[in-house]
Regions:
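C-terminal motif of bacterial Sec signal peptides marking the signal peptidase cleavage site
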Residues: 14-17
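Repeat-blade elements of multi-bladed beta-propeller folds
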Residues: 37-41, 79-99, 125-152, 185-209, ...
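Periplasmic c-type cytochrome electron-transfer domains
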Residues: 43, 394, 403, 407-415, ...
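C-terminal substrate/ligand-recognition segments
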Residues: 84-99, 458-486, 497-522, 592-678
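Extracytoplasmic electron-transfer domains, predominantly the class I c-type cytochrome c fold
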Residues: 188, 501-508, 512-515, 520, ...
Length: 678
């Protein structure tokens, strides 16, 4: 736990340690010596590596806190978080606070130099998450480029003043230039893009339900904010990959976005961009086909956005298997030959390694057959690619012999967090397991039987990504091993005039829209999930106008929903308020298709026991070292601890973990990722 508490302060110390000069050719594979931390995750190669070695295995235990900075905006509801990985430029540390206000502090003293307030009302949810910053040397004072909500801001690095010559008075609206009416789009960017020459290349995060925004990759001129190029991740007529979708999919399908960040090889001018699934994530009957470039690693010419090569990790994704982190540029030695490669970790617990220029596999990958989906109108892809040389760093299937037997008589809990005690079953973990479908990766969801996703929705690997040691060629990645449980719920989706046959057509329509857009967070039964509130008895709290505004504009951690039309908002309001007096022209229901989907995949959440421990045997979180020269896992250890279990004599179990590792030449790995906050 000490490592987690000191992680940020320690990073700052590492960045400012003086280092003797030395010549190591093996360190200079990107014409740098890894002594700076002026880029997200250390450098544009995303190595997470520092060559500084003054802090090492012999003295790390003597580290003490030398200063503390309070960034402000603490949320009293215990939902405050800072995901931002700071950067340091000329002894100034830049970061963002819980509501994404940008700050600059003296990295030696912790004294605040300035703070920039964007003036947006962002909450603690994904709408207000920022994971990193970009410094751009504009040959004047330098600028900090960062995102908050739907905007990219350009701020003077020395003064904290916005650069009014950039974009629209210092900012760019990420909802624009996507080929659809921007007022109807919900778009943010929680991870920084990358700068090549004077071009900013930026990905986005979008809504994951029906009607989501497309995830096209865009490049902007950093002097003006003007759009330079756009790569369509959902191809349009005449573009490569267009035939892998229905002919009009580019008009209505969303997602295939890059929320995880990207990686740049400045020597070749190639940018490597990982993407997520198409929306809706769990049912694809309205997007039949392979769905390029969703779930892909795309190599683009950074000058113009032209595609050089790509690889798709999941065809026609139905499991939300987004690529979770930017890839690592790696130099590896295979049988005496130097290979310049790019390595991508996945939520399913795999590492894929490619030749940087050609996209050829360095280690073999094979297409494996998987069962066909039985859901209405769904056409799952018959095969999925998996590596056959590098072993997975997470277990791939939850089998009966893996049931947690630490407390054999414990009842089962199906919930997002262990705080939902009301969802404790009257059956044991083993008894509940017997009722579930657990067949491993890429098995389709079912209407008839609840299914286990393992590793769960949060990996495998997560957004913290992997670290690469350029000396050894080893990759270090943390991983989750938590089972999640789901079932496909079919709901009423009549078309056009058929709604008129319903007993309460307006409220029925509203319930259908709610199921698609809101049930994933607030629950299919309006009871809420985890710390997300339930929506029962809203008529005692809001009138129809107040509730309509909340649905449209969002509130707190709830994102705005511009993709929901006025008639849909009216119908949802009627349903949520149980109001029979809201009139709606039934002809407006004709606007439904093509984004109406007949299923909501209801995630009961993590499969745990009544004490909040995972239903699967440990380890529940691991740290892994993988030798990319040989394609072998060198070691794997539990990451994280439940102290109360250790005191009872159990071996360290590991915990779920999200942040990524930092690797140093002092022989150390620092990682502040686990949830064991004692």
């Amino acid at each position: 736990m000490l490592m987690k508490q000191i992680n940020l302060s320690l990073v700052f110390i590492l960045l400012f340690s003086c280092s003797k000069d030395f010549d190591r050719k093996e360190l200079n594979f990107l014409n740098q010596n890894f002594k700076q931390w002026n880029e997200y995750l250390g450098d544009k190669a995303r190595t997470h590596y520092s060559s500084l070695n003054q802090i090492n295995k012999s003295n790390v235990k003597t580290l003490k806190k030398v200063w503390e900075y309070k960034s402000g905006d603490l949320n009293g509801k215990n939902t405050t978080q800072i995901q931002c990985s700071p950067i340091v430029i000329d002894s100034i540390l830049y970061g963002t606070n819980p509501v994404t206000k940008l700050f600059a502090i003296n990295a030696k003293t912790g004294k605040e130099l300035w703070k920039f307030d964007h003036g947006q009302d962002v909450g603690p949810g994904w709408w207000g998450v920022n994971r990193g910053l970009i410094y751009w040397d504009d040959k004047v004072d330098g600028r900090i480029i960062y995102t908050s909500g739907s905007y990219i801001y350009s701020v003077d690095a020395l003064t904290g003043k916005i650069e009014n010559t950039f974009g629209d008075k210092g900012k760019i609206d990420l909802r624009k230039n996507l080929g659809r009416p921007f007022e109807t789009l919900s778009v943010v960017a929680n991870t920084p893009g990358v700068v090549y020459k004077n071009i900013l290349i930026q990905g986005t995060r979008v809504h994951e339900g029906p009607g989501a925004s497309p995830g096209h990759i865009r490049a902007y001129d950093l002097d003006t904010g003007d759009l330079v190029w756009r790569f369509n991740t959902i191809p349009q007529p005449g573009e490569y990959g267009y035939e892998t979708w229905p002919k009009d999919a580019y008009k209505y399908v969303g997602g295939a976005n890059s929320w995880a960040g990207m990686t740049l090889d400045e020597e070749t001018g190639i940018v490597y961009i990982p993407t997520g699934s198409a929306s809706y994530d769990f049912w694809g009957g309205n997007r039949k086909g392979e769905n390029l470039f969703a779930n892909s690693l795309i190599a683009l010419d950074a000058n113009n956005g032209n595609r050089l090569w790509h690889f798709q990790f999941v065809h026609h994704d139905l499991w939300d298997r987004d690529l979770p982190a930017p890839p690592n540029l790696v130099n590896i030695n295979i049988e005496g030959k130097l290979i310049k490669a790019v390595a991508q970790v996945t939520k399913s617990g795999h590492v894929f390694v490619f030749d940087r220029k050609t996209g050829n596999h360095i280690f073999p990958v094979k297409e494996f057959p998987f069962p066909k989906s039985e859901l209405e109108d769904e056409e799952s892809w018959p095969t999925q690619p998996l590596p056959t040389k590098i072993p997975p760093f997470a277990r791939q299937e939850f089998t009966k012999d893996m049931i947690n037997d630490m407390f054999p008589n414990s009842k089962a809990l199906l919930a997002w967090t262990p705080n939902q005690k009301e969802k404790v079953s009257d059956k044991t973990i083993k008894e509940v397991f017997e009722t579930l479908n657990s067949q491993g990766q890429f098995h389709p969801h079912s209407e008839e039987k609840r299914s286990i996703t393992f590793p769960g929705l949060d990996g495998g690997a997560e957004w913290g990504g992997a670290a690469f040691d350029p000396n050894s060629g080893w990759l270090y990645v943390n991983s989750n091993e938590m089972p999640w449980v789901s079932i496909a719920n079919k709901y009423d989706t009549p078309k056009e005039w058929e709604w008129q046959l319903k007993k309460d057509p307006v409220k029925s329509y509203g319930k259908s829209i709610y199921s698609q857009q809101c049930s994933r967070c607030h629950g299919a039964d309006l009871d809420g999930i985890s710390n997300i509130p339930g929506l029962k008895n809203l008529k005692n709290k809001f009138n129809k106008n107040e509730l309509s505004l909340i649905i449209k504009n969002g509130k707190g951690s709830m994102m705005p929903m511009p993709q929901v039309s006025e008639s849909q908002i009216k119908a949802m309001t009627a349903f949520l308020l149980d109001d029979d007096n809201i009139d709606l022209d039934l002809n407006s229901f004709r606007e439904l298709d093509p984004n109406i989907v007949p299923y909501s995949i209801n995630y009961f959440g993590r499969f745990m026991d009544e004490n909040g421990y995972p239903a699967v045997k440990p380890p529940w979180g691991t740290l892994n070292a993988i030798d990319l020269n040989k394609g072998e896992i060198v070691w794997q250890v539990p990451l994280g601890e439940y102290e109360e279990l250790t005191k009872q004599g159990f071996s360290i179990t590991g915990t779920e973990n999200y942040g990524g590792p930092i690797l140093t030449d002092g022989g150390l790995i620092f990682i502040g990722a686990t949830n064991d906050e004692y």
